[in-house]
């Protein structure tokens, strides 16, 4: 296999926290029964993109679930949680036009990424570092590196299949951005150990990597069978589209997963970061985060309208890439109420009512 170089991550600028604060947010609200209910903004309403679904998803998702269950050696509780996750459905909506082979790789990776997220939540810094070494060595040295860890064996399976058709530049971006993800969750683990809540600007930069979205966006190229030139992906407008998509997905996730995460005492979430940085209560912070989601959609539309031309052939590929980003935005917003990850089986009901009762703090399960 060819070598893969590593380059440092370029951080996108983020705006001062208080400059983003909507003028109508109330800084302090009275405590009482109202404080025990979390009200969500309608995140889907501001997204102008149609929801699409890959026609192969039903059987591909079933095959992928069986593969992960076989490799992961779940307990019964973990198995039920994994099935309720329904990661395959998210893939079917994010990668709506690819063939079954590419969709299977995407499904396997998406389920793998969600498991990494859960495993890293349970690890300290040393455990997370060991996880990183096993996975990244598998990607850098697929022909020679050997590890019996579940993470490495699972990664080797989908990676060897992906290598059959992935373009060299897309491959580079995939590996590089997964490396960014691991570096970021190491920082997240360190913050958890020290009980540190970062300020808003620091968190936004970190969250763009802990989300795993950057690697998911590389899969857009793989799924479409394209390999965009580096100068296209590195263009400021394309980067602005990537950041806007990442922010929209990450912040929607933070809003809708906040109740579950606060019940575990997990503070790597936009809501507590806003509460601390801006000095407002949890409901005001949720409203604030919803406003940021709406702004990220607006920024995406502005960037799309300003795209330059790179010539007919590349422009067609860019159009496919941007379509994939749009699919990611709407798919994540809708899927969040279809999965059992955040609301159990109550997702459809909460999708209509847009509110939940505040859960008690019980710690990590």
Swiss-Prot record:
Mg(2+) 1 binds at residue 117. It catalyses: (2E,6E)-farnesyl diphosphate = delta-cadinene + diphosphate. Mg(2+) 2 binds at residue 117. Its cofactor is Mg(2+). Its EC number is 4.2.3.-. (2E,6E)-farnesyl diphosphate binds at residues 341-342. Pfam families: Terpene_syn_C_2. It is an enzyme of class 4 (lyase). Keywords: Lyase, Magnesium, Metal-binding. The record marks 114 as: Plays a critical role in the stabilization of intermediate cation. SUPFAM superfamilies: Terpenoid synthases. GO terms for molecular function: metal ion binding; terpene synthase activity. GO terms for biological process: isoprenoid biosynthetic process. A motif (DDXXD motif) lies at residues 117-121. Mg(2+) 3 binds at residues 253, 257, 261. A motif (NSE/DTE motif) lies at residues 253-261. The keyword NAD does not apply. PANTHER family: BETA-PINACENE SYNTHASE-RELATED (PTHR35201:SF4), TERPENE SYNTHASE (PTHR35201). Terpene cyclase that catalyzes the cyclization of farnesyl diphosphate (FPP) to various sesquiterpenes, including beta-elemene gamma-cadinene, delta-cadinene, and alpha-cadinene. Belongs to the terpene synthase family. The conserved DDXXD and NSE/DTE motifs are important for the catalytic activity, presumably through binding to Mg(2+). This is Sesquiterpene synthase 3. The lineage of its organism: Eukaryota, Fungi, Dikarya, Basidiomycota, Agaricomycotina. The gene is STS-03.
């Amino acid at each position: 296999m060819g070598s893969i170089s590593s380059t440092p991550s370029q951080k996108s600028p983020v705006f001062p926290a208080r400059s983003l604060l909507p003028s109508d947010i109330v800084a302090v609200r009275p405590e009482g029964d109202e404080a025990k209910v979390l009200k969500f903004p309608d995140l889907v309403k501001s997204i102008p993109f149609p929801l699409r679904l890959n026609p192969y998803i039903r059987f591909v998702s079933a095959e992928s679930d069986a593969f992960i269950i076989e490799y992961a050696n779940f307990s019964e509780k973990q198995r039920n949680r994994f099935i309720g996750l329904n990661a395959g459905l998210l893939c079917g909506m994010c990668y709506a036009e690819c063939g079954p082979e590419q969709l299977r790789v995407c499904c396997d990776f998406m389920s793998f990424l969600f498991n990494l997220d859960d495993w890293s939540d349970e690890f300290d810094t040393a455990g997370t570092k060991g996880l990183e070494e096993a996975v990244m060595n598998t990607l850098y040295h697929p022909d020679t590196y050997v590890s019996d860890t579940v993470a490495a064996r699972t990664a080797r399976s989908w990676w060897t299949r992906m290598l059959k058709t992935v373009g060299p530049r897309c491959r580079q971006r995939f590996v590089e951005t997964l490396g960014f993800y691991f570096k970021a969750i190491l920082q997240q683990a360190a913050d958890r150990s020290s009980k540190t809540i970062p300020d808003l600007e620091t968190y936004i930069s970190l969250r763009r990597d802990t989300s795993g979205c950057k690697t998911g966006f590389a899969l857009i190229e793989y799924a479409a069978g394209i390999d965009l030139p580096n100068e296209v992906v590195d263009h400021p407008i394309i980067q602005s589209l990537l950041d806007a998509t990442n922010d929209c997905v990450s912040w929607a996730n933070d809003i809708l997963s906040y109740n579950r995460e606060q019940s575990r005492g997990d503070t790597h979430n936009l809501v507590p970061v806003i509460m601390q940085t801006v000095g407002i209560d949890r409901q005001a912070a949720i409203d604030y985060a919803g406003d940021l989601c709406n702004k990220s959609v607006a920024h995406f539309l502005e960037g799309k309208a300003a795209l330059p031309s790179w010539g007919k052939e590349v422009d067609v590929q860019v159009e496919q890439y941007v379509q994939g980003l749009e699919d990611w935005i709407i798919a994540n917003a809708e899927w969040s109420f279809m999965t059992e990850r955040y609301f159990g089986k109550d997702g459809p009901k909460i999708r209509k009512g847009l509110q939940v009762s505040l859960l008690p703090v019980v710690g990590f399960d």
